[in-house]
């Protein structure tokens, strides 16, 4: 298959690995006991690394840290409770992406709410939810708008359409978050040693490569934006290792077939019309992060489900035995969590990192 097979070529992979090995041999200060730490921010990268066994092919002096780039994984329990509270209303059809169905809050999960009689539906696009609203004028249709900048354009365009069509029974619960402030928070705390970053491809497709430059300049860490195939990942690692060996600190773009310097400007325009930054947002396991989330602008406040239904914020503490937050910032591996593969597994997911198809714990368990 074009654009897939050529990025899974075993001979090219072997060549990249040999080049990596040669560079690392010239860096004797990095050892298996004191490795070079690279954070792959995106959960999609985590799954590629484990699915294709890249972690076992790389030099032992390179170790991965799994970052907070999975929106379902950082979804606070209190936000799920708000969704369940709305979904239980008899006049509501609640629409969500499938990954969010099994994330647990204090009140349970959306899947359990559906089993108890709530009209909860899985959709693949916010436009699907808008169509449901148009076809059910006697119902209030609520879409759970969840995700990083990757999903924000489709949500913004859907709300623009709802406004244009004067759809009065369509609302959103806004849980869209942004990646750059999160990485700022992670780096400013200095809790985890990170030598370089594999930056997310899909988010960068929207925001471009430029926003990473401030992080690079402020914290003196190299970034390489990369795609999701095995050769994408290997080439990006080679680019990072080369920068570190040459004592350079730059933002490089391995994913040039998709990502451009300024990103998708039409998508950015739609986002800026519909959304604005919030003062702060809560992240599961990470706490409050300044300017890391968005809310609807004044022109689109009429679509805010939490305003319409007068929802109160839910503050729910994470389980003290769960180490989701530590996994998200690289302080521990999934297997170090006492719940991993015991109380928390894919069939009975306790933590969000096990629920999501992009979660680090799900990747560890599966592969």
What is the role of each PLM region?
Residues 93, 140-142, 196:
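Structural motif
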Residues 144, 148-211:
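Phosphate/pyrophosphate-binding betaalpha-module
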Residues 1-138, 152, 156, 162-165, ...:
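Metallocofactor- and cofactor-centric catalytic cores in central/energy metabolism, strongly enriched
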Residues 173, 191-260:
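A conserved active-site cap/scaffold subdomain adjacent to cofactor or substrate pockets
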